Amino acid sequence: MNIGRGDQRRTILLVDSDPHCRAALRLALEGAGFSVGEAANDEEGERTALRVKPDAILAELLMDTPHGRGTVSERLKADGSIIPCYIVSTASEALMGSVGLHELGISGVFLKPIDTAIVIQTLKGRLGMGDSGA
């Protein structure tokens, strides 16, 4: 895991049950100058987020959550977290109209297949990073 702030890189936490999706996003994000942490499920994602304090989280939407505890973003928001959390999903645009994303603590949605250039541009804009660093 490439997590840390010694080089002042912004840290992104990937929470996705698909190791191939995590690997593809990791390569793109690290290539753009981000540090990347990974978690395979929401519970692990919550623990990792509390430990490493990422600058943003990309989390799979349709993931089993233990005991109906809600998504990682909902649980972190309930604990007072202000970490921007983006959903990664195969769901259609209908989802976005039917769910109050901000009420769930969601900053935005990226649809699979992921366009990594859009993800990187969005994260850099949200985190105040210029294009000059990557």
Regions flagged by a language model, labelled:
Residues 67-71, 78, 91-109, 117, ...:
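Alpha4 helix (beta4-alpha4-beta5 surface) of REC/receiver domains from two-component response regulators
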Residues 15-16, 39, 57:
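Conserved sequence signature across two-component system core domains
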Residues 50-52, 75-83, 104:
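Conserved phosphotransfer cores of two-component systems
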Residues 38-47, 68-69:
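Helix N-cap/capping motif at the beta->alpha junctions
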Residues 19-37, 104:
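Two-component/phosphorelay signaling modules centered on CheY-like receiver
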